Curated annotation (Swiss-Prot):
EC number: 1.3.3.3
Top-level taxon in the UniProt lineage: Bacteria
Taxon lineage: Bacteria, Pseudomonadati, Pseudomonadota, Betaproteobacteria, Burkholderiales
A GO BP entry: protoporphyrinogen IX biosynthetic process
Gene giving rise to this polypeptide: hemF
Residues noted as binding substrate in the record, renumbered to the chain: S93, N109, V110, R111, G262, G263, R264
Cofactor: a divalent metal cation
Name of the featured protein: Oxygen-dependent coproporphyrinogen-III oxidase
Length: 303
């Protein structure tokens, strides 16, 4: 496989979505809704979602394969030579917002983008892969952070020992709220614009990232899901979820691309938490579990 094999990527992504949803349904004992949709400009997708669950207060596992005739500005900003080309984008993107504040929120995304060669021009299709997974705890545990990062490292090491440290640093830098001077969570891995190893190797690495999600996250869910909590923890969870909203609406490239490309708003904003709150200049009391989170919201080596 040397050309851009769009059907193979699509088959992998739809299978990944199905496997993840099946595992989450088994863990939570609640069924996800299925919402298939079409995009007038080209393409469509399938959204699998759950709202008001006992384990997951809001969860979305989304597949999309969309097309357009001209690259939107967010996609061509780093590649101005591709401006004006037709394009295809496909991926699986997911965000899970658990109900129990001791279970962390998580995000995972794997995707491929293709800028098509223009008829009559001496050029070829240009592809690149991207993705990653990251963890956003409210009441963090070092064991959870180390487990999550070990799973990320183990996914990437077969493709080269330099990938994990590079993509870990990229994640720390990407999921950073500049106006708050803090990371969104404890990181994970993040990559974009991957095509230099060639199509086969780039696709293989992306599959490893997607396949690593369940072993990275589900053991943490099982370890924390039955921890008792009360109004104090739920209140702090809602406050910290506000940071998630701030990042997604101000900095996230995927959100910006979706909105600029005329994407499906319901799918794009499914990453938002169901409840969030803001307070003016609130600071947790020193020595409390809430104050301990600040020590985790800065880049550090976990493995």
């Amino acid at each position: 496989m040397t050309a851009v094999a769009i059907p193979a990527v699509r088959d992998y992504l739809t299978d990944l979505q199905g496997r993840i949803v099946a595992a989450l349904e088994q863990a939570g004992g609640e069924a996800f809704r299925t919402d298939a949709w079409q995009r007038a400009e080209g393409g469509g997708g399938v959204s699998r979602l759950l709202e008001g669950g006992q384990l997951f207060e809001r969860a979305g596992v989304l597949f999309s394969h969309v097309k357009g005739t001209r690259l939107p500005p967010s996609a061509s900003a780093h590649r101005p030579e591709l401006a004006g080309r037709g394009w295809e984008a496909m991926g699986v993107s997911m965000v899970l917002h658990p109900r129990n504040p001791y279970v962390p929120t998580t995000h995972m995304n794997v995707r491929m983008f293709v800028a098509a060669a223009r008829p009559g021009h001496a050029e070829s299709d240009v592809f690149w892969f991207g993705g990653g997974l990251d963890l956003t705890p409210y009441y963090p545990f070092e064991d959870d952070a180390r487990h999550f990062h070990r799973a990320c490292r183990d996914a990437l090491d077969p493709h080269g020992a330099d990938y994990y440290p590079r993509y870990k640093q990229w994640c720390d830098e990407y999921f950073f709220l500049k106006h708050r001077n803090e990371t969104r969570g404890i990181g994970g891995i993040f990559f974009d614009d991957l095509n230099d190893p060639g199509f086969d190797a780039s696709f293989a690495l992306t599959r490893s990232v997607g396949d690593s999600f369940l072993p990275a996250y589900l053991p943490i869910v099982q370890a924390r899901r039955d921890m008792p909590y009360g109004e104090r923890e739920r209140d702090f969870q809602a406050y910290r979820r506000g940071r998630y909203v701030e990042f997604n609406l101000v900095f996230d490239r995927g959100t910006l691309f979706g909105l600029q490309s005329g994407g499906r708003t319901e799918s794009i904003l499914l990453s938002m938490p169901p409840l969030a709150q803001w307070r003016y200049d609130w600071q947790p009391q020193a020595g409390t579990p809430e104050a301990a989170l600040a020590e985790f919201l800065r880049p550090r080596e976990w493995v």
